Amino acid sequence: AVLDWAVGRNVGFSKFVSLGNKADISESDILEFLADDPSTRVILGYVESIDDGRRFLRAARNVTPRKPVIVVKAGATAAGARAASSHTGSLAGSDRAYAAAFRQGGVLRAGTVEDLFDLALGFAMQPLPLGDRLLILTNAGGPGILAADTAERLGIPLAEVSAPLRARIFPALPPTSSLGNPVDIIGDARADRYGSVLSALRDEPSVDAVLVLLTPQAMTEPEETARATVSAFAGSGKTVLASFLGEATVASSRRILSEGGVPNYAVPERAVRTLYAMLRYSRIRRAAGHVTGEAPSVRPEKAERIVSETLAAGRRALGEEESRGILEAYGFTFPRHAFAGTSDGAVAAYREMGSGSVVMKIVSPQILHKTDVGGVRLDLRGEEDVARAFMEITSSVRRLAPSAWIAGVSIQEMVTGGRELIVGMSRDPQFGPLLMFGLGGIYVEVLKDVSFRVAPVSRSDAGEMVREIRSWPLLAAYRGREPADEGAIVEALMRVSRLSCDFPEIQELDINPLLVMSKGKGILAIDCRMTVAEAP
């Protein structure tokens, strides 16, 4: 089917590989081979599963600075993943891990096979845009508006039609034309009118890409307009895409465009989405070469002792004190805290911490979500509050989690201000440690506004994670509130990345909430949990 499609659209394939069940050759082998294949300019792929995700990521990082890699990943939903696993005999892995790995590896992900073919046309036929300013030329208002809407949704800026450009194209246009962007040369436009405008756009420095739209009307000349489009941009190095709408009336003109190296799309939105992918790939090439940064001030020997002792005791879940110790070894700071096994011990700990407000939390290796069992009390002030909270917490836990062993309670200085975040890590069967970042506290489960990357991450990766969440504006300055300390967040992600790579025994890690203060004032880890297992 793919080859049949290619023949009909004047796209050639240098190689066509079907891997079957990948008994001996994998997609990573093929990527590594095609990286240096001089006859291959664009790599397309249909993927159901990747057995060695980390090798694939290395291969992708090697090839994508030189050639675009465009992939359709099946099994994105739970039902699709089950079908893919059954089909290939291997685990499909989590789609969020694939999405993160593709992004880090510079792989462009097509949502459908139709998108895959659309992107293939654009990359195979046209040069990459040198900038992101798009000009839309149309003979009908509706398609131009649809294209402009899609561009705005994708963040593609429309080029300003400068005064010198207006002066060059105005003589060729009727007074009813619109010289905004889209440039609407109205429905009676023949090929010469298109040609005059396109010739002016060829060397226009304020325009990086051109989208030519045509709807067949009484006076339209589709074939001649197609030839004018090809002629105007031949050898120019400027990106030009077309959408000649219709079927039989524009069939021959589409062939002319294709033979002239101008990809044509059935509707304007598909052309704009292709341009967006080309712009993304241009940024990928410019960003190539970022190296993974090292987190400073780490003491892996302390973390190693805690992990080893936990595994030797036959436990999977670390206690809060143990989790805190590992994170402190990797440079995280916590509010002042103390452990108490009795009510009297809790009061004594409160006295030592001095006056003020404290938080009390249950300490039990069997309890990961403390609030679910009534294991947290906030804003305790005075010895009576502390003693009463100890009794209330332990009674609630005995009632709601009778099988849990209660070691005692943690008493922690109450911290106010800042924004609550979550930083976490889990291990994906294909890609290994997968970092997570998002808004913390109660918002995690409700909003699910999180971003992911495969560790190890670069500082650039970590910065993208922070700005990728929908709630990023809440971390920036707004309504008189100072911006959050983004540098400290990036540093925290780098430290968790280093920790997850240093200790494959750590299976899951959550720091929630991680309290970020205003710019320059750092972060505080408030609560944390970890699970471990013997490394494979």
Q: What are these regions, as identified by a protein language model?
A:
Residues A1-P536:
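Catalytic-core regions of core metabolic enzymes
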